[in-house]
Structure formats: C-alpha cells, structure tokens
C-alpha cells in the first residue's frame, strides 16, 4: 500500500519563488504579466514615424527606416531630431534605400504601397518577412538592400567586397542592419521617443488632408489602397473635366509623371514579363549553373523553361476530348474509347504505337476466363514490349477512372511505374487492380467479341491454344491532333485581333452606340447612323408642304377671323341673389 507524497504545507522554496505562480508574488503578478505582454513590434516595411507602409524608403546610419516625405515633414516641425531615438538627425544624413520586389504579390501590403510585388532579396529572390535578417550596403547617398545570408555567403565569406547589384566596392563598415530577428527590441514601439512623449504618428500633408476630410487612409491598406487611390483619382479627374466642359468619356492618351519635390523615385528592378503558354513551372537552371561554374557566363534571371508540344499536351486535364480507335482482330473488331484527360501518357503511347504499326500481327499471350486477356508484346512471351519513348513511363492514378466494368482497357506492368506497350481487357469489374494499373480506355462497341476471346481454350499457363491476333489498330479520332489544330486556330485568331487592335480596331470599335464615330485623336463626329431615327419624318414634311411664291400672295384676299362668341353654359347659373 503506497503512501501519499503531497505535502500539506508550502515549502520555503515554493513560497519565495520569483515566478508568477509564487504565493509571495501577491498583487504584482498581473502587473508583471501586463508589462511583458505590452511588446509591440513595428513591421519591417513600415515607416518608423508614420507607422504605415513606406513608399519611398530612406534610413538613418543606425538602420531606422522612414518614408522620405514623412521624415521631411517631421524635420520641418522638429529640426535636427530623430523621432525614434531623439538623437540629432539632418536631411543630409538620410540614405535612400533601393528595395527589389517580385512581379506579383501574395500577401496584402507586403510590398511597397506605390507598386505591386513583395520585397525580396535581389539575388536569391527570397521574400522578406518580419523574421528575415535584412541589411543594406551603403554607397554614399544610397544603399542596396539584401538578406544577411546573401551578403554573408557571397561577400564576407568569399572575401568579395563588391556589391552584388551594381558591382560597387564597399567595406564592412558600409553594412547597415535594417532588421535583426535576434534583436527585436530595436523595433519595439514602446521604446520610440516620440510615442513616449505623447506625439501621434507623423503624417504627410496629403494624409492629413485625407484624415481631415474623413476619407479612408489608403496607404494603410497595402495593395488594396492602390486601387482605392486610383479610383479616387479617376473620379476627381472626371469631375474636373466635366467642370471645364471636356469629354469625360475620352481616354487619356498620355500619362503624366508625378514631379514631387524631394521625392525619391524608385524604379522596379525586375521587369514584368508575360509568360508563354507552354512555360514550365521550373527555370532553365542557367542562374544556378553560372553561380557554381566559372566557365559559364553569369546569369541572374530566373527564366522559365519552355515545354515542347508533347510535354505540354501530356499534362493531366490538358487534352479533354476523348479519342476513338478500332482494334481489328481475327475474332472481330473492337471499338475503343480513349481518355487522354486522366491518362495522357498512356493514350499517347497507345496511339503512337498503333500509328507506327507496332501492334500489327501481335498475339494475345495471356487469357484468363472471368478475369482478363492481355496482349501488346511483340515477342509473345509476356516479358517484352517497349513504349514509344523507349523506356518505362509512370503510372497515372489521379483521375476517377477505375476497373468498374467489362471491357476496361488498362496498362499491364511489372510493378510501380513500369508501363511499356502491354495492355489488357478486363472481363469483369476488378476493383482490386485500382491504383495498380492505369486505366486509359474502354470497349464501347462489339463487346461480344470479348466473349469469343474468353471462350478460347488455354493451356496450363493461360496461353490461348488458338491464336488471337491483332490485325491492325486504326485510330479513328486522335485527340492530340485535334487539340493542336484548335490551338493553332486560337493563336491565329489572337494574332488577327492584335493586328486589328494595332490598326485602330474594327468599325464597331470606332463607333459608339449613339452612332458617333471616334476619330484617331479621340474626338467624335456624327455619321449617317445618327440620323437613322426619324430621318423619314423630314422627307414627309417636305413633300406635304408646298412651296409658295411671293408673287402669288398679292392676289389672295385677306380677312380677319371673326370673334368667336362665348358659349353660354346651361344650368342654374349664380345663386348670389337667392
């Protein structure tokens, strides 16, 4: 029988413990917890003065990031003072930061608010986060921003003290730390001097006007704020054009560039490129090869590899049209429906081998009644056969096709991903073969031919005693050829549309619904279409109104129209004298 070990009293060590669960901590427990829970971290892409995403970033020599417009307004109100540390700061001490960004953004507000894209390392293209060690390499009045891992691996350890972007020399003293995950206290909002003194976040003049007008602060919305700003600018532009009597529906032919004084214009370091239709999900590997071999020309762009027509079509769910083939045997003909949508490689292999006559004269070497019949091996041993690529190809189990009925056509194999040229027809549903053999077709006509094959006697090794030969396989409808024709037709149609667009568009594009034709300069002119409504009324009026000469008017007598007498109304009249 055991004894209890829990003491009925509190020990000295438990009473004097310094943690929050000590009985001696008293009422200070909640106060200590509140002090540790009040930590607020400024995101790396936020201005330290406005506490909002920056547009044109600059930094101080100690690595504090500001927006150039915001810090300019602050220094006008508080000359020679850093809002974060309170130390002396002048405009000439600010360093312009060159951030790189990718072409597309996956997160709200992750990039600069005046353009699209996430902030990235310009060499490795890794997206910056709040946990990335970010540094800047200073070159006078500007600095290029990198991840610390890139600079440490390619500059410091390699002893190559040249900037990886513009090839400028630098020293270790030129490296400025913008964000260090191990030193989160440097971005703690509770330590900012201007917040301790009760000052509010500094805003630009434009942001102050928006706040006074009660509008939404678009800068705090990230990429959504850009759309709001563009919509508001378009409405304001249309209102001004309407006041000046201009045509608000006319498209602008020129874009004006903002020329704000003291604003640092930062151009995108990566150009947007429209990917080709047959672009792969992986790159050509030239950048990796040039980094690892000095014998290759340096390459920094992650160019996408291009797929061939065959590789492009052999992606699942690319070619969705079904194909048809006729298998001619000495027992009769079988009409087969092929499914390239879910098994494109198996269907392509079967069609190409059939078109080259690979299956002509090939016998079915294995026949098991109430199970299946197998063929496709020119050697007839069951151990031969070769695919159209000359090697095994992978299984395709992602589709919904299963061995759910008689006449199912599947690939025979020796194990996982060992498909070649052999195939088999199922005599009955065989669900135990699902996800073991690729289903790529089914018999849709002359299913009774399978019954004739099933009734052929076999020897002890399931080999038919009477040969069942494949005379030929005729492809009635090639889905891949049809896909290529449709693709070429679509490309030709797209080129024609682009050609017409460059020439100014069609007649329908040049004419509005009111019948006005749009000129090349954007103005409008009336056409005959504008007079289509009511044009016959003018002709009728002209025909019904005869022309009168002034000489004829002299012989016509004129008279005054007699004054019409007022009709007396019946009834009782006025009742005033009653």
Swiss-Prot record:
Q: In which pathway does it act?
A: Protein modification; protein ubiquitination
The chain positions of domain PPIase cyclophilin-type read 321-475
Keyword Isomerase among record annotations? yes
Q: Where is the composition biased (Acidic residues)?
A: 551-560
Q: What is its EC number?
A: 2.3.2.27, 5.2.1.8
- Ranges of biased composition (kind: Polar residues): 538-548
| Isomerase among keywords | yes
Recorded hits in Pfam families, A to Z, give: Pro_isomerase (PF00160)
Q: Which GO terms describe its biological process?
A: protein folding; protein polyubiquitination
Instruction: Outline the segment boundaries, as ranges, of region: Disordered.
Output: 240-260, 505-578
Task: Give start-end ranges for the coiled-coil region(s).
Answer: none
A Gene Ontology molecular function term for this protein is: ubiquitin protein ligase activity
Compartments annotated for it: namely: Nucleus
List cellular component terms (GO): catalytic step 2 spliceosome
Q: What does this protein do?
A: May catalyze the cis-trans isomerization of proline imidic peptide bonds in oligopeptides thereby assisting the folding of proteins. May also function as a chaperone, playing a role in intracellular transport of proteins. May also have a protein ubiquitin ligase activity acting as an E3 ubiquitin protein ligase or as a ubiquitin-ubiquitin ligase promoting elongation of ubiquitin chains on proteins.
Q: Which family does it belong to?
A: Belongs to the cyclophilin-type PPIase family. PPIL2 subfamily.
- Name recorded for this polypeptide: Peptidyl-prolyl cis-trans isomerase-like 2
Per the UniProt record, the source organism is Gibberella zeae (strain ATCC MYA-4620 / CBS 123657 / FGSC 9075 / NRRL 31084 / PH-1) (Wheat head blight fungus)
Tell me what gene encodes this. Answer: CYP8
């Amino acid at each position: 029988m055991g004894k209890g070990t829990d003491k009925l009293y509190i020990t000295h060590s438990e009473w004097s413990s310094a943690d929050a669960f000590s009985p001696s901590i008293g009422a200070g427990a909640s106060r200590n917890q509140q002090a540790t829970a009040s930590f607020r971290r400024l995101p790396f892409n936020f201005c330290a003065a406005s506490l909002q995403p920056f547009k044109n970033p600059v930094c101080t020599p100690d690595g504090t990031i500001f927006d150039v417009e915001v810090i300019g307004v602050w220094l006008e109100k508080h000359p020679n003072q850093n809002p974060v540390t309170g130390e002396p700061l002048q405009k000439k001490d600010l360093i312009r930061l060159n951030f790189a960004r990718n072409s597309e953004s996956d997160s709200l507000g992750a990039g600069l608010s005046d353009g699209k894209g996430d902030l990235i390392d310009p060499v490795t293209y890794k997206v910056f986060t709040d946990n990335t060690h970010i540094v800047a390499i200073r070159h006078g009045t500007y600095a290029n921003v990198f991840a610390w891992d890139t600079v440490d691996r390619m500059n410091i350890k390699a002893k190559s003290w040249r900037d990886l972007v513009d090839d400028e020399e630098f020293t270790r003293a030129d490296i400025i730390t913008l964000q260090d995950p191990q030193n989160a206290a440097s971005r703690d909002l509770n330590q900012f001097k201007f917040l301790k003194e009760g000052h509010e976040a500094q805003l630009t003049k434009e942001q102050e006007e928006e706040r006074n007008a009660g509008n939404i602060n678009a800068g705090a919305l990230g990429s959504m704020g850009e759309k709001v700003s563009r919509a508001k600018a378009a409405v304001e532009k249309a209102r001004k054009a309407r006041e000046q009597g201009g045509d608000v529906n006319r498209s602008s032919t020129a874009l004006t560039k903002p020329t704000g004084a003291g604003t640092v214009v930062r151009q995108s370091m990566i150009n947007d490129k429209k990917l080709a239709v047959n672009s792969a999900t992986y790159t050509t590997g030239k950048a990796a090869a040039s980094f690892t071999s000095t014998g290759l020309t340096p390459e920094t762009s992650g160019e996408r590899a291009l797929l061939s027509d065959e590789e492009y079509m052999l992606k699942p769910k690319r070619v969705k049209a079904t194909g048809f083939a006729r298998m001619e045997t000495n027992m009769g003909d079988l009409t087969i429906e092929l499914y390239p949508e879910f098994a494109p490689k198996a269907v392509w292999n079967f069609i190409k081998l059939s078109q080259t006559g690979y299956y002509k004269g090939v016998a079915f070497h294995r026949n098991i009644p109430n199970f299946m019949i197998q063929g496709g091996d020119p050697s007839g041993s069951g151990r031969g056969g070769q695919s159209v690529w000359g090697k095994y190809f992978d299984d395709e189990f992602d589709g919904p096709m299963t061995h759910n009925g008689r006449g199912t056509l599947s690939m025979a194999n020796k194990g996982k991903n060992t498909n070649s040229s052999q195939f088999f027809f199922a005599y009955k549903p065989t669900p135990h073969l699902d996800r073991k053999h690729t289903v790529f077709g089914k018999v849709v006509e002359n299913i009774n031919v399978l019954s004739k094959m099933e009734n052929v006697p076999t020897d002890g090794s399931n080999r038919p005693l009477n040969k069942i030969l494949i005379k030929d396989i005729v492809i009635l409808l090639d889905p891949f050829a049809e896909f290529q024709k449709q693709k070429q037709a679509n490309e030709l149609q797209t080129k024609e549309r682009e050609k017409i667009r460059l020439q100014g568009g069609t007649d329908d594009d040049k004419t509005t619904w009111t019948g006005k034709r749009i000129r090349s300069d954007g103005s409008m002119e009336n056409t005959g279409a504008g007079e289509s409504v009511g044009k016959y009324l003018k002709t009728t009026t002209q025909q019904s109104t005869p022309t009168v000469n002034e000489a004829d008017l002299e012989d016509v007598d004129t008279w005054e129209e007699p004054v019409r007498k007022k009709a007396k109304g019946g009834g009782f009249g006025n009742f005033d004298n009653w």
